[in-house]
Amino acid sequence: MDILTLGWVGLLGLFTYSIAMVVWGRHGM
């Protein structure tokens, strides 16, 4: 796997995780 691809996957995963935490926090989970 290319290092650039790995970086994008990591960044996208971190972004998705952050959104999920905010949504769950608002719903009181």
From Swiss-Prot:
It is a single-pass membrane protein. It is found in: Cellular thylakoid membrane. Signal peptide: none annotated. The keyword Transmembrane applies. It comes from the Bacteria. Disulfide bonds: none annotated. One of its GO terms (molecular function) is electron transporter, transferring electrons within cytochrome b6/f complex of photosystem II activity. GO terms for cellular component: cytochrome b6f complex; plasma membrane-derived thylakoid membrane. Its main location: membrane. The chain crosses the membrane at residues 3-23. It holds the Pfam family PetN. GO terms for biological process: cytochrome complex assembly; photosynthesis. Keywords: Electron transport, Membrane, Photosynthesis, Thylakoid, Transmembrane, Transmembrane helix, Transport. The keyword Aminoacyl-tRNA synthetase does not apply. HAMAP family: Cytb6_f_PetN (MF_00395). Belongs to the PetN family. The 4 large subunits of the cytochrome b6-f complex are cytochrome b6, subunit IV (17 kDa polypeptide, PetD), cytochrome f and the Rieske protein, while the 4 small subunits are PetG, PetL, PetM and PetN. The complex functions as a dimer. This is Cytochrome b6-f complex subunit 8. It comes from Cyanothece sp. (strain PCC 7425 / ATCC 29141). The gene is petN.
